[in-house]
């Protein structure tokens, strides 16, 4: 199965490597024609305002919103999650795709120097804790009724699912643990 990584900015190579390790074909997505080729898409972390500018420059902004509305499975990490959110509490003027019913706070867990790692309980992927890496991570402050919380940190959601959308505040691509990427492939994209 061909799974894309939105390839305009962020942890692109790391996600491509994880897709390959799950036994699927990775594709670096930089155009609408490449977007049309994939069975699922990963939106990496990076800097959300830069990502918006580049997505619009390469005509991916509206195409991605339409693809997600049409059922394209998406997994978004960190800044990717910010782009999907319905609302950014501390930057209300920032545009989003608005397809995930959450309200987030950018850099909610602190700036770069406040980055940290912690073990998370994620029952959907097994009993062994997942070592999560948070880098300038957003906090999910509110979730709509259609959003399922898969994991929390200090009572705040950090891994959520809504239909064919999976999103995390943390960066599983920076670990060697494939379980979240495998969950995306098996449970969100499903079998073709």
From Swiss-Prot:
Enzyme Commission code(s) on record: 4.3.3.6, 3.5.1.2
Q: Could you cite one Gene Ontology molecular function of this protein?
A: pyridoxal 5'-phosphate synthase (glutamine hydrolysing) activity
Which keywords does this Swiss-Prot/TrEMBL entry list?
Glutamine amidotransferase, Hydrolase, Lyase, Pyridoxal phosphate
Active-site residues, as the UniProt record annotates them: 78, 171, 173
User: Which protein are we looking at?
Assistant: Pyridoxal 5'-phosphate synthase subunit PdxT
Q: Which residues bind L-glutamine?
A: 46-48, 106, 135-136
Q: Provide the Gene Ontology terms for cellular component.
A: cytosol; glutaminase complex
* Keyword check for Hydrolase: yes
Q: What does this protein do?
A: Catalyzes the hydrolysis of glutamine to glutamate and ammonia as part of the biosynthesis of pyridoxal 5'-phosphate. The resulting ammonia molecule is channeled to the active site of PdxS.
Signal sequence segment: none
Sequence similarity: Belongs to the glutaminase PdxT/SNO family.
- Top-down, what is the taxonomic lineage of the species of origin? Bacteria, Thermotogati, Thermotogota, Thermotogae, Kosmotogales
Q: A single GO BP annotation from the record?
A: pyridoxal phosphate biosynthetic process
Its annotated pathway?
Answer: Cofactor biosynthesis; pyridoxal 5'-phosphate biosynthesis
